[in-house]
């Protein structure tokens, strides 16, 4: 495999080319990309955890340092002002020397407010990309050039096509997340609480809870019916029935996002349903290819959900086609089949049909689908179907013409298990689909 340094060199060349094109299209001279700043909690002197500007970490794997600035023009070596204060109160990251620093000019910035004297004097035609517009105004950036929509749309669109460097980083993030999932399953099998399972996960991945790319979903029993459950009970339930873990990891700023579901017992209806959802997820991935709309795969999985609802006699006396047509599958899988993945967990440009930002919304029937694009080589996506037993979604179906088709007794028996979700991260290639998650033998 090529070294990360050589992959990064090519990555920078790609970003430079995209920058040249964007600057030419929008008649700008350069982009000033801000890592961000710390913001204090209201009426307090403690800051919120720092989250770096994703457009900044696209260029450099600097994810924990605020007050950094990057100047890029698509021609000259990118120039990074790296915040390096004299500070005995807080940890100060040293000036980086790593695989990537040969391709970026790194300059120490001793004072956060010192950037103004270091930038080019003529700034009227520089675009600012960052989270603090007032800082850009103070630096003399034109208001119309602060986070210009056309530039951001352009950069977001092409972020969908991962470079080989980005894919290498994402494969490393997968390894970390897989380690965490294995440790979490072991903790579940030993009877730990959600809180303690989460600690086991973080320890195995080498992350703090502020470093993971999203809040871990560690859901035992009926908590698995809450799609984004993040409470973390300190006490283990008296009876362990099920465990849904949706948790990721980050490497050089790139995310992994995996979900697995386990049954405490191997010989009940729920365990068989977990196996069947897993099998159908793999079967769907086996059909995926470039040139097909992601929406089509979402719709196809509703047909697979219908098959499972019929097989497990959760819905009875109705054809699979009629289930999908009348949206009886909807309350059981209320979210989309997945989303784009990269520098952000829900990565950008999911609805963009071109580099001008043309928007194609999700189908009205499936409003929570996060991706409506045609699959193309270089795209990275999650595939995360599920079946859940959520009373607020099932309640409207308890009356009306379709109520008789719901096996309410079976549904009540499954509700204490919460739900099921299986999620892998896949890369679209020209002639195949790479499943980064299964390649690491995570069952």
Swiss-Prot record:
Q: Any one Gene Ontology biological process term?
A: proteolysis
Q: What is the purpose of this protein?
A: Splits dipeptides with a prolyl residue in the C-terminal position.
Q: Where does Mn(2+) 2 bind?
A: 246, 257, 423
To which protein family does this belong?
Belongs to the peptidase M24B family. Bacterial-type prolidase subfamily.
**Under which EC number(s) is this enzyme classified?**
3.4.13.9
Q: Report if keyword Metal-binding is assigned.
A: yes
| UniProt cross-references to NCBIfam families, sorted A to Z | PRK13607.1
Q: How is the cofactor bound?
A: Binds 2 manganese ions per subunit.
Q: Which domain of life is it from?
A: Bacteria
Describe the reaction catalysed, as an equation.
Xaa-L-Pro dipeptide + H2O = an L-alpha-amino acid + L-proline
Molecular function as annotated in GO:
aminopeptidase activity; metal ion binding; metalloexopeptidase activity; phosphoric triester hydrolase activity; proline dipeptidase activity
**Keyword set for this entry?**
Dipeptidase, Hydrolase, Manganese, Metal-binding, Metalloprotease, Protease
Where, by residue number, does Mn(2+) 1 bind? 257, 339, 384, 423
User: What enzyme class is recorded for this protein?
Assistant: hydrolase
Checking Pfam families in the record gives:
PepQ_N, Peptidase_M24
Q: What is its cofactor?
A: Mn(2+)
Q: Enumerate the SUPFAM superfamilies for this protein.
A: Creatinase/aminopeptidase
| InterPro entries linked to this entry | Creatin/AminoP/Spt16_N (IPR029149), Creatinase/aminopeptidase-like (IPR036005), PepQ_N (IPR048819), Pept_M24 (IPR000994), Peptidase_M24B_aminopep-P_CS (IPR001131), X-Pro_dipept-like (IPR052433), X_Pro_dipept (IPR022846)
GO cellular component: a single term:
cytosol
The answer, when asked if Membrane is one of the entry's keywords, is: no
Tell me the protein's name.
Answer: Xaa-Pro dipeptidase
């Amino acid at each position: 495999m090529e070294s990360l340094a050589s992959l990064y060199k090519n990555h920078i060349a790609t970003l430079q080319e995209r920058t040249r094109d964007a600057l030419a299209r929008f008649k700008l001279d350069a982009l000033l990309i801000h890592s961000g700043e710390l913001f204090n909690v209201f009426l307090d002197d403690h800051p919120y955890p720092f989250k770096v500007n994703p457009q900044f970490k696209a260029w450099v794997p600097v994810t924990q340092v605020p007050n950094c600035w990057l100047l890029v023009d698509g021609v000259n070596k990118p120039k990074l002002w790296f915040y390096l204060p004299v500070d005995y109160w807080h940890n100060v990251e040293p000036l980086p020397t790593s695989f990537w620093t040969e391709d970026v000019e790194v300059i120490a910035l001793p004072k956060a407010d010192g950037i103004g004297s270091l930038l080019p004097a003529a700034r009227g035609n520089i675009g600012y990309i960052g989270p603090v517009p007032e800082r850009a105004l103070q630096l003399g950036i034109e208001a119309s050039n602060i986070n210009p929509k056309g530039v951001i749309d352009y950069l977001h669109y092409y972020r969908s096509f991962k470079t080989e460097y980005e894919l290498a980083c994402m494969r490393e993030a997968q390894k970390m997340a897989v380690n965490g999932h294995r440790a979490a399953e072991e903790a579940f099998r030993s009877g730990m609480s959600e809180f303690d399972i989460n600690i086991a996960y973080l320890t195995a991945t080498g992350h703090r809870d502020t470093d993971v790319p999203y809040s871990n979903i560690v859901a035992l029993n009926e908590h698995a019916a809450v799609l984004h459950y993040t409470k973390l009970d300190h006490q283990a339930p008296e009876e362990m029935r099920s465990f849904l873990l949706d948790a990721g990891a980050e490497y050089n700023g790139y995310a992994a996002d995996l979900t697995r579901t386990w049954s405490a017992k191997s010989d009940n209806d729920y365990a068989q349903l977990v196996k069947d959802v897993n099998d159908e997820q793999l079967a769907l991935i086996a059909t995926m290819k470039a040139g097909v709309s992601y929406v089509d795969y979402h719709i196809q999985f509703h047909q697979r959900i219908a098959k499972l609802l019929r097989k497990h006699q959760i819905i009875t006396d109705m054809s699979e086609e009629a289930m999908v047509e009348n949206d009886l599958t909807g309350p059981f899988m209320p979210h989309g089949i997945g989303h784009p993945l990269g520098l952000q967990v829900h990565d950008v440009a999911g609805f963009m049909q071109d580099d001008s930002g043309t928007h194609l919304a999700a189908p009205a029937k499936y409003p929570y689908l996060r991706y409506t694009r045609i699959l193309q080589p270089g795209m990275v996506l999650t595939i995360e179907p599920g079946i859940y037993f959520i009373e607020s979604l099932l309640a409207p179906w308890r009356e009306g013409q379709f109520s008789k088709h719901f096996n309410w007794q079976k549904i009540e028996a499954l509700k204490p298990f919460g739900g099921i979700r299986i999620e892998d991260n896949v890369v679209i290639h020209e002639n195949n689909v790479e499943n980064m998650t299964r390649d690491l033998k995570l069952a």
